[in-house]
């Protein structure tokens, strides 16, 4: 009879501790994505409004961005993160509420910068939205 192979005889993966990180907030018109990385850009945690349980037009609300930001922030707390630099990209409605949620979770925000790509008269933008 074949012997059952035992799995996992290797080393246990140790979670590293990171004191300073960067929170990348990508706020589009349809969704908000938050990725928390270390200074080198290695992802520690991420969350989106769609992945947090919001579907359809509810993804593009400030409350959905707040919930997604709290989810990503709590997942990154396992790494011992204390200070966060925030980089916001995009024109979406969840920009400000995502930053406020990071502050409410308990991170010390050291810097907030807008890294939205600005065209030097490049592609024609989509038609004006009709509500």
Swiss-Prot record:
GO terms for molecular function: rRNA binding; structural constituent of ribosome. HAMAP family: Ribosomal_uS11 (MF_01310). The gene is rpsK. This is Small ribosomal subunit protein uS11. Located on the platform of the 30S subunit, it bridges several disparate RNA helices of the 16S rRNA. Forms part of the Shine-Dalgarno cleft in the 70S ribosome. It comes from the Bacteria. Part of the 30S ribosomal subunit. Interacts with proteins S7 and S18. Binds to IF-3. Belongs to the universal ribosomal protein uS11 family. GO terms for cellular component: ribonucleoprotein complex; ribosome. GO terms for biological process: translation. Keywords: Ribonucleoprotein, Ribosomal protein, RNA-binding, rRNA-binding. InterPro entries: Ribosomal_uS11 (IPR001971), Ribosomal_uS11_bac-type (IPR019981), Ribosomal_uS11_CS (IPR018102), Ribosomal_uS11_sf (IPR036967).
